[in-house]
């Protein structure tokens, strides 16, 4: 376990140059309780946009899903600083049990917040696998056929040429929320 003083010592040592670290990790398999950070930035309305990602990963996790988590934190910071300008609220949620639990975290949230989601959630943006090194195409998937043209126009600023057409939605990510008729984009 690394506490504050050990962390400060590591930072001091890093100032002298690169370090080699050896980790010893114990893994257990089974059903466990986990935390699921959720933050609400209040706008003028109770209506909200849900921005979600997952914090569990396989392997190193930088691409899936560390970069998206960092982007979500930065979005939350910027929205918080500008909250007086928000027409709608923004809810940020980091799911547990996504990769290993087959979307258990988002399913739990949906089950426990269904009425609020059905009544007030106007859109769900799922951030997953953002910022792949060496990528030259930014793609999208959406449940909003009427929004496909908007997404395509938006992505023109990131891609050379025309973006690929949206890929049809199959079971992955967090389509858990479709039952509440919430438009979804990834």
Where do the PLM segments sit?
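Detector for methionine-enriched segments
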Residues: 27, 36, 72-73, 127, ...
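General small-molecule cofactor/ligand-binding pocket signal
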Residues: 22-24, 93, 185
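Active/binding-pocket-proximal capping segment
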Residues: 57, 68, 142-145
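Extended, hydrophobic alpha-helical segments in both membrane/secreted and soluble proteins
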Residues: 49-55, 63-79, 88-97, 102-106, ...
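Soluble metallo-hydrolase cores and metallopeptidase-like ectodomains found primarily
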Residues: 1-63, 74-89, 111
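Metal-dependent peptidase/peptidase-like ectodomains
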Residues: 1-2, 7-8, 44-46, 95-186
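Short, solvent-exposed loop/turn segments at secondary-structure boundaries
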Residues: 61-65, 137-139
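A short linear-motif detector with a strong N-terminal bias
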Residues: 15-19, 30, 70-74, 102-105, ...
């Amino acid at each position: 376990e690394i506490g504050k003083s050990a962390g400060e010592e590591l930072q001091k040592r890093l100032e002298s140059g690169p370090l080699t670290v050896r980790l010893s990790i114990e893994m257990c398999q089974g059903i466990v309780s986990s935390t699921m950070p959720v933050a609400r930035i209040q706008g003028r309305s109770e209506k909200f946009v849900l921005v979600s990602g997952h914090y569990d990963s396989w392997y190193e996790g930088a691409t899936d899903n560390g970069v998206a988590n960092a982007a979500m934190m930065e979005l939350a910071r910027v929205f918080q600083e500008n909250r007086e300008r928000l027409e709608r609220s923004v809810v940020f949620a980091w799911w547990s049990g996504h990769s290993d639990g087959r979307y258990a975290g988002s399913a739990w949230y949906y089950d426990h917040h269904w009425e609020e989601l059905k009544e007030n959630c106007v859109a769900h943006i799922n951030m997953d696998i953002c910022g792949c090194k060496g990528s030259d195409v930014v793609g999208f998937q959406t449940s909003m056929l009427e929004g496909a043209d908007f997404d395509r126009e938006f992505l023109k600023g990131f891609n050379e040429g025309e973006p690929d057409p949206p890929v049809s939605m199959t079971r992955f990510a967090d389509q858990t929320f479709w039952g509440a008729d919430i438009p979804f984009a990834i």
